[in-house]
From Swiss-Prot:
Lineage: Eukaryota, Viridiplantae, Streptophyta, Embryophyta, Tracheophyta
Chain's role: Probable transcription factor involved in plant development.
Compartment list: Nucleus
Primary subcellular site in the record, as a coarse category: nucleus
Protein's recorded name: Scarecrow-like protein 15
Organism name: Arabidopsis thaliana
Any one GO molecular-function label of the UniProt entry: DNA-binding transcription factor activity
Intervals of motif VHIID: 232-236
Length: 486
């Protein structure tokens, strides 16, 4: 439901107004890399749970009004600075990298001699497990998986071997039901490790930055009209730790005569209570530094599943932008209903960022096909990671454990749960609902090319495909960003 617009109180005047022509000549360091400064977004977080600020250990309340989460927090200005480098001592055992995992299984990163380097025939056993799951022969799947456990004991070796290990673990979690445990809030240590992993990933690979900058540019392109409302509302279905909004705030501030107003509604999982407090605190502080008016609200995923877009507060006069990724489609029972409900919101633009290979695998209805496609996709991601980081680099292992492994687990669980039900791909659902793709601007191309030039990792290149701007690794799409309009 939309409510009448009320002009938010203007707390400040805009510092500078920079036209789009000048911005095209910004250097790479000024325009692109400056925007993902994790040090300015996240303060240093200690590994010890007891070191967490009291404000982040407090309760977490929900209200019925607008179905939003209102995190309780207080700004702690005494948090020390974020570390620039991960030290090996931070992860002295495999339990640090794989929380809750039994130490006797030998899944630590140090078990390098346990990997079968004689060939890749372990893939055959992996596919046998998939075939057993697809035919509902779950006991036989367990037998084959137990044999596979003896051959793939740690995520070491070549990219395909490491990917096979993560996919084998995901299959094991699905078969045992361990991925269906009751909701558990993330521990302070887990949050710290994830933040560090994301920061380091952004530092060595162009993949995260490509996702953020292309999405932000698609949003900015939709707001470039002279008649645009100064009030921008972004509905984000995968906000993460919110670092991408630093870039967006900078651009809105520079391009808006009035300083701009940004409102974000993030749909988040139930276990992300602590993360939402961090996101709100840091983005609010950053907005104050940028002198931009800013609001952020959170809606529980469970609430959205029940109420759809009625769970979100919309205000008349705002320009609504919806930012989505495959994550939302994994949670919902069907893509078609989501898109039909989205149509009623009448967003200015819908930005879809696919960094999980969904463009090519979703909707097949075949668990085997989706599994093999996902295995190939993440093998390519790991290969690109190897090219960006030196062999044996600890940062690479942390990125795999805290960024890529959860994505693999979620992809396998979704494909397994839907193995008997084919459905439209997201693109088919968009087109069926009357959505049409919008060409991304040349400036988005410019940013992407500059990013690759800065990263200097050979093998990446930028391409265009069916209206998408695509980051490729040796011809295989790793990230595809597209903008759509009803």
């Amino acid at each position: 439901m939309k409510i009448p617009a009320s002009s938010p109180q203007d707390t400040t005047n805009n510092n500078n107004n920079t036209n789009s022509t000048d911005s095209n000549h910004l250097s790479m360091d000024e325009h692109v890399m400056r925007s993902m400064d994790w040090d300015s977004i996240m303060k240093e977080l200690e590994l010890d749970d007891d070191s967490a600020p009291n404000s982040l250990k407090t309760g977490f309340t929900t209200t019925t009004t607008d179905s939003t989460i209102l995190p309780l927090y207080a700004v702690d200005s005494n948090l020390p600075g974020f570390p620039d480098q991960i030290q090996p001592s931070d992860f002295e055992s495999s339990s640090d990298v794989y929380p809750g995992q039994n130490q006797t299984t030998g899944y630590g990163f140090n078990s390098l001699d346990s990997v079968d380097n004689g060939g890749f025939d372990f893939i055959e056993d992996l596919i046998r497990v998939v075939d057993c799951v697809e035919s509902d022969e779950l006991q036989l799947a367990q037998v084959v998986l137990s044999r596979l456990n003896q051959r793939l004991r740690s995520p070491a070796g070549r990219p395909l071997q490491r990917a096979a290990f993560y996919f084998k673990e995901a299959l094991g979690s699905f078969l045992t039901g361990s991925n269906r445990n009751p909701i558990r809030l993330s521990s302070w240590s887990e949050i710290v490790q994830r933040i560090r992993a994301i920061k380091e990933y952004s530092g060595i690979s162009p993949i995260p930055l490509f996702s953020h900058f292309t999405a932000n540019q698609a949003i900015l392109d939709s707001l470039s009209s002279q008649s645009s409302s100064p009030f921008v509302h972004v509905v984000d279905f995968e906000i993460g730790f919110g670092g991408q909004y630093a870039s967006l705030m900078r651009e809105i501030t520079e391009k808006s005569v009035s300083g701009g107003f940004l409102r974000v509604t993030a749909v988040v999982a139930e276990e992300c209570a602590v993360e939402t407090r961090l996101v709100k605190e840091n983005l609010t502080q950053f907005a104050a530094e940028m002198k931009i008016r800013f609001q952020i609200e959170f809606v529980l995923m469970k609430t959205f599943e029940m109420l759809s877009f009625k769970a979100i507060r919309f205000v008349e006069g705002e320009r609504t932008v919806v930012l989505i990724s495959p994550a939302i489609f994994r949670r919902l029972s069907g893509i078609t209903d989501f898109v039909n409900n989205l149509r009623r919101v009448s967003p200015k633009v819908v930005v879809f960022v696919d960094s999980e290979g969904w463009t090519e695998i979703a909707g097949s209805g075949s668990f085997r096909r989706e599994f093999v496609s996902a295995l190939e996709f993440y093998t390519m991601v790991l290969e690109s990671l190897d090219a960006a980081a030196p062999p044996g680099d600890l940062v690479k292992k942390i990125v795999e454990a805290f960024v890529l492994r959860p994505k693999i687990s979620a992809a396998v669980e979704t494909a397994a749960d839907r193995r008997h039900t084919g459905e439209m791909t997201w693109r088919e659902a968009f087109c069926a609902a009357g959505m049409r793709p919008i060409q991304l601007s040349q400036f988005a191309d410019f940013q992407a090319e500059c990013l690759l030039e800065k990263a200097q990792v050979r093998g990446f290149h930028v391409a265009k495909r069916q209206g998408e701007l695509v980051l490729c690794w040796h011809g295989r799409a790793l990230v595809a960003t597209s903008a759509w309009r009803f």
